[in-house]
Amino acid sequence: MANHKSAKKMIKVIAKRTLINKMRKSKTRTSIRKLVDIIKSGDKENVVLAFRNAESNLHKCVNKGVIHRNTAARKISRLNAKVKALMTA
């Protein structure tokens, strides 16, 4: 347990940031899951909007330092490939 006042405060701050980061990750995973579901259903109209939403959430996570930029780039690239495959099919 922390003894210094600043260390006690940092424990609270870290807990708060962890909660916020979990919310951001959850929102991102949900948007990716929705995009994959739309791709599986073959809905070409909504797939572009869902991709933009997922890409936006991934970029926001990178900007806030929640996930690494290479991880986001890899996920966006793979999702984009799936979207393009659906659009050309």
UniProtKB/Swiss-Prot annotation:
One of its GO terms (biological process) is translation. Pfam families: Ribosomal_S20p. Keywords: Ribonucleoprotein, Ribosomal protein, RNA-binding, rRNA-binding. The keyword Nucleus does not apply. GO terms for cellular component: cytosol; small ribosomal subunit. InterPro entries: Ribosomal_bS20 (IPR002583), Ribosomal_bS20_sf (IPR036510). GO terms for molecular function: small ribosomal subunit rRNA binding; structural constituent of ribosome. It comes from the Bacteria. Belongs to the bacterial ribosomal protein bS20 family. Binds directly to 16S ribosomal RNA. PANTHER family: 30S RIBOSOMAL PROTEIN S20, SMALL RIBOSOMAL SUBUNIT PROTEIN BS20C. This is Small ribosomal subunit protein bS20. It comes from Wolbachia sp. subsp. Drosophila simulans (strain wRi).
